[in-house]
């Protein structure tokens, strides 16, 4: 494929050849653990929904879909109009595709069966946060979609589908996110590395722009809502102080950046190196991020990119989920910083990470 697909001449430094997301999936299908046509179509369905969601976000002000819808979700959070649109479009795309038997969404109280016959012959279950950081849409800031894919074992039926789908994140067969920002990126893993695709609006295709992503181990940034600092544990406060201390030998200081959209903060830290934190607090002892469709997919992805994800005491991907909307503390990003956070939270402090 060449620049003939794009509008106008290619700028200096542009990619000389590109691969679409669909071509990439077909080309590498033999390397995927679930290398079937149904699995490939499932990923295509998610990408189609992402394009529709992106279209609505880009035109939200014109279409009058900014602001709240007047309803609340199961989390007792006020829903944005775009929350409902994104949720609907993902469910529609997966229902039309016919490869998915079960979906679980942040916006729905319970899982939804997509199996038309109720026999669950379709083997994939998909969990998603349809529009992470949706409060940012009214101020034209970045938002995202997160998704997680599992296979259901033979013999699962509608009665026990959720029970058998609630499995540790280490058993995911695919996970990823879509970042809707200055450009729109689709980033995913199937357990064989991480690849990022940028949407070319001229041709309506996701093109491979970030192959074989690896998170830098030298951290550049940390992300946390420090407005909650009075609710943090003494160990976490000590860790934050350590993070802010300039390296006496190099003069390097880790900078703070926090957008308020998990996808956006994570995406930046994936590219630059860093740590995202949403800890347990006195008000939220179990944390706030949801395990099945926020922490698990991002943990699977970051480990494939050479990073680490933890509650501060346990690997995220080892957690056994107890419910669709279960919450967890999360420390995710460059492995050295996650390990440092674990050391502080476990009472080993500065000595374990080489001092402040």
From Swiss-Prot:
Extract one GO BP annotation from the record: fructose 6-phosphate metabolic process
UniProt lists the family membership as follows: Belongs to the FBPase class 1 family.
Residues where Mg(2+) 2 binds: 129, 132, 294
Disulfide topology: none
Q: Name one GO molecular function term.
A: fructose 1,6-bisphosphate 1-phosphatase activity
- Keywords carried by this UniProt record: Carbohydrate metabolism, Cytoplasm, Hydrolase, Magnesium, Metal-binding
Pathway terms, separated by semicolons: Carbohydrate biosynthesis; gluconeogenesis
Which PANTHER family did the record assign? Answer: FRUCTOSE-1,6-BISPHOSPHATASE-RELATED (PTHR11556), SEDOHEPTULOSE-1,7-BISPHOSPHATASE, CHLOROPLASTIC (PTHR11556:SF35)
Which Pfam family is one of those matched by this entry? FBPase_C
As its record notes, the protein acts as a catalyst of: beta-D-fructose 1,6-bisphosphate + H2O = beta-D-fructose 6-phosphate + phosphate
Q: Which cofactor does it need?
A: Mg(2+)
What is this protein's name? Fructose-1,6-bisphosphatase class 1 1
Compartment annotation? Cytoplasm
* Listed NCBIfam families: PRK09293.1-1 (NF006778)
> How cofactor binds (record note)?
Binds 2 magnesium ions per subunit.
- GO CC annotation, single: cytosol
- Top-level enzyme category: hydrolase
Instruction: Identify the EC number(s).
Output: 3.1.3.11
Assembly and binders: Homotetramer.
Binding residue positions for substrate = 132-135, 225, 258, 288
Query: Which positions in this protein are listed as binding Mg(2+) 1?
Result: 106, 129, 131
The record ties this protein, via InterPro entries, to:
FBPase_C_dom, FBPase_class-1, FBPase_N, FBPtase
């Amino acid at each position: 494929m060449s620049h003939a697909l794009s509008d106008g001449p290619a700028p200096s430094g542009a990619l000389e050849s590109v691969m679409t997301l669909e071509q990439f999936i077909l080309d590498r299908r033999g390397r995927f653990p679930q290398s079937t046509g149904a699995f490939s179509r499932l990923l295509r369905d998610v990408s189609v929904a992402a394009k529709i969601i992106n279209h609505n976000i880009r035109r939200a002000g014109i279409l009058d879909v900014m602001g709240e819808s007047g309803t609340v979700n199961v989390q007792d959070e006020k829903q944005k109009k775009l929350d409902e649109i994104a949720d609907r479009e993902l469910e529609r795309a997966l229902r039309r595709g016919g490869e998915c038997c079960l979906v679980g969404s942040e916006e729905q109280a319970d899982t939804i069966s997509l199996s038309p016959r109720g026999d669950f012959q379709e083997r994939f279950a998909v969990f998603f946060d349809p529009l992470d950081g949706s409060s940012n849409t009214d101020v034209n800031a970045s938002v995202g979609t997160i998704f997680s894919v599992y296979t259901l074992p033979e013999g699962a039926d509608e009665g026990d589908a959720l029970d058998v789908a609630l499995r540790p994140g280490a058993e995911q067969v695919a996970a990823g996110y879509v970042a809707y920002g200055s450009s729109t990126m689709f980033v995913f893993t199937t357990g064989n590395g991480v690849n990022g695709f940028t949407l070319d609006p001229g041709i309506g295709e996701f093109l491979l722009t970030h192959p074989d992503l690896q998170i830098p181990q030298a951290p550049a940034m940390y992300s946390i809502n420090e407005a909650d600092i009075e609710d943090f544990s003494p160990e976490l406060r000590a860790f934050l102080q350590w993070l802010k201390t300039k390296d006496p030998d190099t003069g390097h200081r880790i900078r703070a950046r926090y957008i308020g959209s998990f996808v956006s903060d994570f995406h930046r830290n994936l590219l630059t190196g860093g740590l995202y934190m949403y800890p347990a607090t006195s008000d939220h002892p179990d944390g706030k991020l949801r395990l099945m469709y926020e922490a698990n997919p991002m943990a699977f992805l970051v480990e494939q990119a050479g990073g680490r994800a933890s509650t501060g005491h346990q690997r995220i991907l080892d957690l056994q989920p107890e419910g669709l909307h279960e919450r967890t503390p999360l420390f995710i990003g460059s492995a050295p910083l996650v390990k440092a956070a674990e050391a502080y939270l476990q009472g080993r402090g500065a000595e374990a990470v080489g001092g402040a």
